């Protein structure tokens, strides 16, 4: 992996022509350019995605991994919640961020929200806005998520 992308982070996609794509959003876009059976690209919102991939991720990391950063996790939880309130407002009259069907923005953003919810599930259930919780529940219980998150047995070197 390091030979393909010196960043040393996942995911990394190496195309047949040798091109390397090492950003999640770019990999999603590439895959959907190949095949987009549910029309997710129709709801592609670069500004919203950039906010969650940068500002929200910043707060998520400092909330989830507070000991690593030495910062007040509650301040970052509050900042993250403020951003989630904006998503909740978008979800007030529709089931998904782009309308009544899931799309690119939903699939790209919900893993961050899922991680945020997982830091303190009881707090999230009590404090996160209702529309947002419903949206997260719909995505977590979706067929797409369940297929992607099948638990596999741990691979060991003995299996070579």
Where are these regions (language model features)?
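GST-like domain detector, emphasizing the conserved glutathione-binding G-site
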Residues: 1-82, 88, 92
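GST superfamily/GST-like fold recognition
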Residues: 97-122
